[in-house]
Structures are given as structure tokens and as C-alpha cells.
Amino acid sequence: MKILIVTDAWYPQVNGVVRTLDETSKQLKKFGHEVKLITPEGFLTIPCPTYPEIKLSLFPGAKVSSMIRDFNPDCLHISTEGPLGLAARGYASRNGLAFTSAYHTRFPEYVYARTKLPLKITYSFLRWFHNRSELVMVPTEEVKKDLIKYKLGILKYGQEV
């Protein structure tokens, strides 16, 4: 199976999201799948203002669309809601492609702590982003309950391969 994973979180960041995606791609390859990752590498980026280790891709739409089209995946997984994730979601929506997504961290709380943007606004964005997904993978029961509370649709745990 050809599996495409799109993520805004990648090396040189060192965090749980990056480690999880790196290990997931390795395990999928061990099972014989062809795995490609779309990461900020190869895109024009700027550092995230409140977290400079995060590289935000600038204007990734056309390149992401081309990469998805060229790879022609059997499975599209969008792991983050940043510029690359948004570009992949847009391509999938415009072209009728199903995709799965993931919610890794308490993003709205993180945004609120740094900007005081009300949680309701960030959760509204997440609801819009993930409700088009066939399946939203979450790391824990606690995170699942949080997202259900904010009406983010049907969720399923990520599972170790």
C-alpha cells in the first residue's frame, strides 16, 4: 500500500509527534508499505513566532498538490493542522480524496497560553479541519474526551503497529 503522511512537525524538532511519525513510517515500511512523508524540508519556511523550532511552510499549496498527485497514495494521513496539513486537506477536499488525521497535543490550550485567543475559536478551527477526516487518531482517552467535549466528531485511538 502507498501511504502518504503529511506533517508540519519534523526534524530538527525533537518531540513526541516527530518521534511517533518517524517510528510509524519505519514500522509501516517493515510491513512492506511504500511510505512517503511531506515535511517542511524542501519548502520555504519561517520560524513559528512563539516556538521557533517549528518551521512554518510558506505558500505550500501548489507543491503539496503536485506531491500528492505524483505519489498517488492509497492512504493519505494528515498529521498536523499547520500550513502543510491545510494544503493537503485542501487538495483532498477539492479532489474527493478520503484522508485520516491526527490530533496529537492540546493545541488550543497552547495557543491560549501564548496569545489569549479564546479556546472556542481554536476548537472551531479544529472542528472544521478534522470533521472532513474519515478518522481522527488521538493518543489517549483523556484527549479523546476533550475533543468529544468540543464536538470534534468520531475519534479512534492511534495504535502501535
Show where each model-derived region lies.
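Nucleotide-sugar donor phosphate/pyrophosphate-binding loop at the beta->alpha transition
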Residues: 98-100, 107-128
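Donor nucleotide-sugar binding/catalytic pocket of nucleotide-sugar-dependent glycosyltransferases
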Residues: 124-161
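Short, well-ordered alpha-helical microsegments
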Residues: 84-87, 144
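Short N-terminal targeting/anchoring amphipathic segment
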Residues: 64-85, 95-100
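Glycine-rich, highly charged phosphate/nucleotide-binding loops
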Residues: 50-67
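N-terminal subdomain of nucleotide-sugar transferases
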Residues: 1-43, 71
